[in-house]
Amino acid sequence: IHGGFDATPGTLKAKLNVRGNFLMDELARDLDIPFKRNGSLVVCTKDQDRSGLEKLLEKGTANGVPDLRIIEREELIAMEPNLSDDVTCALFAPTGGIVCPFHMTMAFAENACTNGVKFFLNTQVDTIEKNGDSYRISTLHTDTKNKETFEAKVVINAAGVYADVFNNMVSENKLHITARKGEYCLLDKDAGTHVSHTIFQLPSKMGKGVLVTPTVHGNLLVGPTAVDVDDKEAVNTTASGLDSLAATAARSV
């Protein structure tokens, strides 16, 4: 759960990031979601310019992120003894947190169902057509092959890497999404206490780096990579990807 220091001040994203972070404690209680406000650190190494952290601090302060500050190595190592020798300072966001994304997604779905939302699973959208002030959505059930048509005043396109397909059915502004695959390494619970905060790397010309974080279940999560791929369903992991994670993570821990 991001603190909100990276979003551009004045944008809707910045407003909702900080507001959403604030609401997480209540949401976790209401929906019984595993949630821990463990705080996050954006670490800066010897070969990086500290001004990058200062810019994030300025953005976070403008966005209203509470208790945001830069801490020096002595205090930092007291908080996280296993940080790399190259780490010199870090931006500390106490409001950062972690959840289980699977539990969270299911909790949202269960709550929606309780509130009357109907789910049409295994249902493929074939076409979306503008019909006056509404939309006509033609679907095919992938198991029974039954066809069904829906009318809707509003269609929310939440199709991920396939969002361009549905956008292009109705919009003159055609889109093409190039999928970007991220590989993670989930370590055993024996490694779960290696760090207690979510450790981000300061973005550089070489990319955003990888994070190292505990999970709410006690594991350690490292990642992701970021590789453009042609196959939108390429969810396989690779030896080269995992090697890259290990090498990049070593910059911070």
Region spans (language model):
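General beta-strand structural signal in soluble alpha/beta enzymes
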Residues: 69-72, 119-121, 157, 222
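A short, glycine/Asx- and small/polar-enriched loop/turn
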Residues: 48-51, 79-87, 129-136, 192
